[in-house]
Amino acid sequence: MRLYILVLAAIAVTLVFASSGPAITYHEVGTRALRQASITDEKSDDSLNAQAPPLSKSEKRLSRSFRTTSRRLPYTNYYHPQYYHPQNYHPHYNYPQYHSSPHVYVHQESKKSWFVRMILEAGIFWAVFHCLSAAFC
């Protein structure tokens, strides 16, 4: 009987810690998508710059003298495969993750659901504590 209670307590503790929150937040998903887009941006710079207007003489002169500071930003084509891809969309709300500010996509848990979750977790911890104390005392 005590072994049965210990197994139930271990399962309850595992469920509590597993349900305490996602391993990766929506904010991290957005920033990772942005970081990946910027990495692929640098790799496929020529394919994106193909639709940009040609450099003027002064811009060419500047780019020769100040290669690091005056680099033109690539033309951003959002129908390019690196942007228009199912992985760049939010799994539930389905809006694109290539927005300039990832803070738009931060998932805010409501106070009511947070309060309910805290009460449930406190109840589970109380039940596990009493099961363990009954098993060992």
Curated annotation (Swiss-Prot):
Q: What is this protein called?
A: Secreted RxLR effector protein 67
This protein's major location comes to secreted
Keywords of the record, alphabetical order, are: Host cytoplasm, Host nucleus, Membrane, Secreted, Signal, Transmembrane, Transmembrane helix, Virulence
- Share the domain note from the entry: The RxLR-dEER motif acts to carry the protein into the host cell cytoplasm through binding to cell surface phosphatidylinositol-3-phosphate.
Cystine pairs: none
Family, per entry? Belongs to the RxLR effector family.
Recorded topology in the membrane: Single-pass membrane protein
Q: Where is this motif: RxLR-dEER?
A: 32-61
- Signal sequence annotation: 1-18
Tell me where on the tree of life, at the top rank, the source sits. Eukaryota
The record's function comment reads: Effector that partially suppresses the tobacco programmed cell death induced by cell death-inducing proteins.
Please verify whether the record's keywords include Cell division. no
Record the organism: Plasmopara viticola (Downy mildew of grapevine)
Positions of region (Disordered): 40-65
Q: Name one GO cellular component term.
A: host cell nucleus
Which residue ranges does UniProt annotate as crossing the membrane? 114-134
Induction comment: Expression is up-regulated at later stages of infection.
Q: Where in the cell is it found?
A: Secreted; Host cytoplasm; Host nucleus; Membrane
